[in-house]
């Protein structure tokens, strides 16, 4: 799945804390990270990967060292900057993250916050309109991309132009270190990445897909607290990859794993194409006994 997800034109990615026990010191935990790579519709897999620390080494090993070329939809963290500078990956900004900045400025600057949030709301209304058209016409593939591109060009582009003008006008008027100043600076600093989606219907307006996929890890962490070792973290990443991808395809993860383990027991080294057919997006459950007897 990792090799296939790296063939995506666009990847969503995000990370969350993944504490694990330090095997050299009893009762001490080290702070790692669990990354998720959410593949596009042609490579529909959710792949998790553990990094031992909070550096760029994990994402480098998964993407850069494996020669991923494409769009990367992510929060604007410094850990990604060198990937975008390399020219092999193109940043797609996250409007949900940008919106959060203006929402956090609501208490100290309610008037400007309301204006900014209302403009961002209009951008999401364009996306919702596209969804309704796509659903009503039962469009798929490139037809979806074209509807989204046309609607964004027609309706989102003027909203974005108006918003950018407002940001530039308000920037010198706000207190330099205020939450609103930080929100405006964030939007302007990442404007090119934030507006990249308007020209390509294949791209998404935000990184919510990755964030929602990681939410299960954050919730589960309250119960299991940490991984028992580095190897335990790696095993967890594999299991999360399988079960999350099953969930994406509405496949019963327990039934899938039960069947997969039986198949692997009979054929420990399946041919690549056979193994590909066993992945959750193509997997077919075995016939039931009642079906066999019928």
Name the predicted role of every residue range.
Residues 1-294:
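Catalytic center-proximal scaffold of phosphoryl-transfer enzymes
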